Amino acid sequence: MPGLVVFRRRWSVGSDDLVVPGAFLLAIHFISFVLVAVSLVLFEYNTSVLSVKLLFYHLISYLLILFFSICVEIGICVISMRGSILDSEARTSINIWIYLKSLVILFDISWLILGSIWLSNYYMEAPIDEAKKIFIAIIICNWTLVFITLITIWCTFDAAGRSWVKMKKYQRSMRETESRFNYKRSNSMNRNWRQRKVMRAYQDSWDHRCRLLFCCMGSSERNRNSFTDIARLLSDFFRELDVVPSDVVAGLVLLRKFQRLEREAIVRQRKNGTYEFLSGVPITEHTQFLALNDAKNYDFFQTVIHYMYFAQGAYGWPMYVIINRSKMWHLVPELKCFGCCCGSGDDSQVIQDNCCYCNYAALKKTLQLGDIDIVYATYHVDVGETPFFVAVDYTQKKIVISIRGTLSMKDILTDLNAEGEVLPLQPPRDDWLGHKGMVQAAIYIRNKLQQENLIERALQRNAERSTHTFDLVLVGHSLGAGTAAILAILLKPEHPTLQCFSYSPPGGLLSMPAVEYSKSFITSVVLGKDVVPRIGLNQMEALRADLINAIQRSVDPKWKTISCSVICCGCGPEPTSVVNMSGQDTHINQYQEERGTARSTSAHPTDSSIALTLHQPLYPPGRIIHIVRHHPKPDENVLKNREPVYQAIWADSTDFDEVLISPVMLQDHMPDKVLAALKKVISDVDDERTSVNSCSTAS
């Protein structure tokens, strides 16, 4: 950080990122140098033979090229290791070494071309077998290196890099002029024109990346509009963020350690009455644990677990196979290509499943926990159009609509379309905003329910069992959770008694007025440090500021910072900035102040910078049950040794305003992990009851 500027343009790589590629090339070229030198010393070359003479001169030339390559690569590695992440002045001379390396590469390619010509013309007739075998191996190896180098250059190419350099040069000249003459020039029109030009270039670049990444999806009008919206969002988010991917990695490593130190300091100081943290959540005397000893709460929690099976079943056969690796053969009898021979009398309507109805088979296997009748299941998927199914749950006497979460590239596009959009209500409420992609998905499902008359069909499914009296329940996980919550709000006027269970919903889902309204009928479930409920656009802007603040505090080279988290499973030496903060409340308080200042600066940038678009905060829906882990200490008396105890607490929507960096931040989002954690909460409560009863009996 910042991005390397060579050849009059910015690149998506930092001057301190060249240590690893430089060391890799150095190792390969050193081995090649040894092989060539050994072949020149050991083998006798009869220069009276033209083919041997040409080979000898080729090897001598390449030995010189390798020598210069090794020298330049040593220089690049040494220079690249200098200074901290932000101290690019210590690496200013890296540009000269890159230009030298580029020149050496040109000589290398020229030599490879001549060597390839020699192979095509003289390889068969050259009477020196061992030397020419080494020669062809070196040729192949170096062509491979050239190909890898070109791929790397293509990956680090910044399409808007030249415009960026011009804009920065202009801003620098403006600041120098203002400083020299001690006045501020009003030249906003020219400045804004340059900024718009850069932003347009970056938006086009992101649009191109989206089209390349999702090239298999076709180029429909809906997809093109989605690409444009996402490109605008991403270019806006990364505006004037002069970082490269490795900076983000180093920032995440530091931020995780800073967050841990901050939590330790809060507990040590008993700030706000906090006496411990569970899964990153501050626990105080006011924390509301779900009282599962109460029969009503216990039954409600069992209902939460019950409907998690519906949310998991919507994922179809991929999730079933992941969860049941040793039992996936159980699906075979349920497949259509086999089941049709057995005279299956299933009258469910299944839309756009695969040829063997694998998804529907997995759904039926997942829902074998009660008396459940599947009425309708669609696996059609497009941008803003999510698969779902409708079922009659005779066990709970409910009509269940379950919506699938993210599973395809089209689902990812729906997720990324994260701008706020007004919910389509009658009468309209301008302050009720929702995640744009999920609003579109909810409208699609609502229209489908109305066009196919699905809710009415489910209510009339079995008059003898009074299905017409059943209430409506909406469930979903991840993308499905967000869509289900918005759909519940849309259907609430027509179905006043409906309920919604939203598992691992996205953080940037609803504006606060809509969240407050939803608390009476939506229950959300979040596991541990799950990142998805914490990554709304507003939270991402805070994360952006926190990463920059963490990087600014770093005094170590980037390679050392990153290696601290990977050497010996994270057992390497701690970064210097972390060591300086450890146990020092003054330094931690200073860090907190700097973090607040960084967030404020991000929200209110200076006039000379490219202002960020401020996004209205969006939050997870409804009342939130947060499943947290308590890792027992060695001196604690626990029921199961070394196993964390899972507990459920009531959380507020505003509690998920910060991304917690953790190895489990992605794992905690998986539906099977959520279901397992919910069951462990009940299991731990049951074990505690059994232990108490045993003690009472013994006494």
Q: What is the predicted function of each stretch?
A:
Residues 2-475, 479-699:
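Non-catalytic, mobile gating and regulatory segments of ester bond hydrolases
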